[in-house]
Regions:
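Preference for long, amphipathic alpha-helical scaffolds in soluble/luminal domains
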Residues: 1-530
Length: 530
């Protein structure tokens, strides 16, 4: 894209090298960077982007893989956008411009009433007022309409001008849109199509943001989860009894990052779009440390966070990520984009987010919250799958959802002998690997059933934490898991990172291999009174 726009990017060579190095032997690129079979979308876009830079041998292998691919060839609108730069045969799917003018109250009613539109209205999914949708749509709509050679009428020009104004108003202080890479790249492209020059201050700031997201090895991160990571670090420090003075700066950062609405976003700059998961974790971290660290404004921040979460409970009893009553799902996974487009734009209640909110409410002993907690617990029971576990949206995946739910049920004082709780515990125990650890393959995210994989320190830690919190102390289970962690620990105290521990498009969170083993080991140490 930057080549097309004529923009000089100082990390360009590193990015090119990184992409080439991650090509599979068969010529494809996978959904993740390691141990991943070929993915049509990623292979198509990688080969198109690198045609000028790859050797003929590598390019030929990629083209042959694409020609012989027999699977689903559906492309999401952002992939279409990037491909349309060089290919005239690619049309960008985008909804009608009038959708942005539909009153928000009407849009919300579609989600609350669970309206299903006929498939002929494929764009109808964009009526749902998801935080993702609202931020991702305008660049695509602008580019798609300007690339069409048809004449722009008065109404279309007016609607495009409204979208342009919206883009200019929603750029964050760090230069991004939505604090993530894709909407930022899309907006740079849209501004270019609107006639903005590369030296325009808004484009310059956006490019600086992308540069900061790009590692020195050329890997472009989708985002930085500064609030999420810092909250996890606070809880790991607290569990391991790290000096309170070391935690104060972390706490001050979390306090500064709180939005005016009372919630937290995943990054400090995205003040207009707090989410329930980060709000729950930030509030939980502040409460856990409040007995040891007292900073002005801390109690007020906790209360505002709780109040925000209480207002965001869906009518079904659970919590989604960004919105209230935006949509709903059946028990289990959300169908991935390559099976049924549009579901990833929805924001229904999910087990992992609901669990984190419940854990926060339980830890804070919220006054008069019994009705809210019971409503959430009923939803979790409905969402539980036949094998005993839960599907988690923001981690990988069935292990993640199940462990987070069990930890939350323990925190709110649920009876661990109830059958639905025991079924979940039994499932986790049953899938322990012979090496003592736990692991799940990234393809679970796309599967209706869990796909167990090789053990990782992240997933092993999730299970150990939840089992210990549920009162499981069988040495054959817990000690075997702890032995796995200790065997994996390196000389410098760190642990190897899993090839993937997070989801949506499966990704790796580098901090997970530090904070979760630290929490698990610290809990075990306290149990053994070492």
């Amino acid at each position: 894209m930057l080549d097309y726009l004529g923009i000089q990017y100082k990390k360009k060579n590193a990015v090119i090298k990184w992409i080439i190095e991650h090509q599979n032997e068969d010529g494809s690129w996978g959904a993740i960077t390691e141990r991943s079979k070929g993915n049509y979308r990623n292979t198509l876009i990688s080969s198109e982007a690198l045609k000028m830079y790859m050797s003929s041998k590598h390019l030929e292998k990629a083209e042959n893989w694409i020609k012989t691919y027999q699977g689903n060839k559906w492309l999401d609108p952002y992939t279409q956008m990037f491909l349309s730069i060089k290919r005239k045969d690619i049309e960008i799917f985008s909804p009608p411009l009038f959708i942005n003018s539909v009153p928000l109250k009407i849009c919300k009613s579609f989600g609350k009433l669970h309206v299903n539109f006929p498939s002929i209205f494929s764009w109808s999914i964009f009526l749902y007022p998801s935080g993702w949708t609202r931020n991702a749509l305008p660049p695509l709509q602008i580019i798609a309409n300007l690339k069409k050679k048809s004449r722009l009428g008065f109404i279309k020009k007016y609607l495009l001008k409204r979208l342009e104004d919206r883009l200019l108003k929603t750029q964050l202080k760090n230069g991004s849109w939505f604090d993530t890479a894709l909407p930022t790249m899309g907006t740079i492209y849209a501004l270019h199509e609107l006639g903005y020059r590369n030296n325009d201050v808004r484009i310059v700031k956006a490019l600086k943001f992308l540069d900061e997201l790009t590692d020195t090895n050329g890997h472009l991160n989708r985002f930085r989860l500064t609030v999420w990571d810092t909250s996890l670090a606070i809880m790991a420090f607290r569990e391991s009894d790290i000096s309170d003075s070391d935690i104060k700066n972390c706490v001050k950062f979390i306090l500064r990052a709180q939005t005016k609405k009372g919630g937290w976003a995943f990054g400090m700059y995205n003040q207009n779009l707090p989410d329930n998961d980060d709000t729950a974790l930030a509030t939980l971290a502040l409460r856990k440390i409040s007995g040891n660290v007292q900073i002005k404004g801390m109690e007020g921040a906790i209360l505002r966070g709780i109040k925000y979460l209480l207002t965001m409970q869906n009518d079904d009893g659970g919590w989604g990520a960004f919105d209230k009553n935006q949509s709903y799902k059946k028990p289990g996974r959300i169908p991935p984009y390559h099976e049924e487009y549009g579901h990833e734009l929805k924001d229904p209640s999910t087990a992992d987010v609901t669990a984190h909110v419940l854990q926060t409410l339980g830890e804070n002993k919220v006054y008069n919250s019994e009705k809210i907690i019971k409503k959430a617990t009923r939803w979790l029971k409905r969402d539980q799958l036949s094998f005993g576990g839960w599907w988690g949206r923001w981690g990988l995946c069935y292990i993640y959802g199940t462990t987070q739910v069990l930890s939350s049920l323990s925190t709110i004082g649920e009876d661990m002998n109830k059958s639905y709780v025991k079924n979940a515990i039994d499932w986790l125990i049953d899938i322990q690997n012979d090496d003592g650890g736990w692991g799940e393959h990234y393809s679970s995210y796309y599967s209706e059933k869990p796909i167990i994989g090789e053990s990782t320190v992240e997933q092993t830690s999730w299970v150990l934490i939840s089992l210990m919190e549920c009162g499981i102390d069988d040495p054959k289970i817990i000690e075997k898991g702890m032995d796995f962690l200790l065997e994996k620990q390196k000389g410098d105290g760190s642990f190897p990172k899993a090839y993937t521990a997070a989801a949506i498009d499966p990704g790796r969170y580098d901090l997970y291999s530090l904070v979760f083993p630290l929490i698990a080991l610290s809990k075990y140490k306290k149990r053994c009174k070492i």
